Design a protein with these regions (language model features):
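Extracellular jelly-roll beta-sandwich "head" domains, especially the C-terminal globular C1q domain
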Residues: 38-197
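Intrinsic low-complexity, repeat-rich intrinsically disordered segments enriched
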Residues: 1-59
Length: 197
């Protein structure tokens, strides 16, 4: 076994490929070594419904959640103006973790009795990530679901919610910035690519 000491390793051709090891090999990064650069769980984003009045929705209807504010989205992967969806960018294929929070308000009606949350990939609905019946609620309550999706470049993910009960409900939002306590009670979604996928 030998040791190679260098400050920089590059391919012979510009934009070429450098391969370390082959199938079945193990490459070990010793304890205490910091790995920087390309190995990261990006893209990453956190968006929410910024209107404190919320998004008015009809009871029992699977409705796309209009996330219209980026708390952070350094790669610009979430459309907060038109389609309200995440799109996998070039080089971003892999498994993604999503955490969606749905804050429901009964809009002063007769309350709501069941809340569901689901995603759709390329327009096709997935099974519910959250679906629960509750005692009739008239106050704003928060429901959370998590999901891991295997996505390819160009795939887009949309987020939907349903509240059953009175004729109209609201998906509650929160005005203010990152540090506002109301953000914890706001309709939001965070997502990132899992390292190693």
């Amino acid at each position: 076994m030998g040791t190679i000491k260098a400050t920089n390793i590059e391919p012979i051709a510009d934009n070429g490929t450098v391969t370390l090891g082959s199938s079945g090999d193990t490459i070990t990064v010793p304890t205490g070594v910091t790995v920087g650069g390309g190995i990261s769980n990006t893209p990453v984003f956190f968006v929410d419904q910024s209107n404190s009045a919320g998004q008015l929705v009809s009871a029992g209807v699977n409705t796309k959640i209009q996330f219209n504010r980026a708390i952070f989205d350094p790669s610009g992967v979430f459309d907060i103006t038109t389609n309200y969806r995440f799109t996998v960018p070039s080089g971003g294929a892999g498994k993604y973790f999503f955490k969606t929070t749905l804050a429901v308000n009964d809009n002063g009606g007769g309350g709501y009795t069941r809340v569901s949350l689901n995603t759709a990939v390329n327009g096709t609905n997935n099974p519910y990530v959250f679906d629960n019946s509750v005692n009739t609620l008239t106050v704003t309550s928060v429901f959370t679901g998590t999901e891991v999706l295997d996505l390819s470049v160009g795939d887009y993910v949309e987020f939907f919610g349903i509240a059953y009960g009175a004729s109209l409900h609201r998906f509650a939002g929160a005005s203010g910035g990152w540090s506002t306590p109301a953000l914890a009670r706001s309709t939001s979604v965070a997502g990132f690519r899992l390292i190693g996928t």
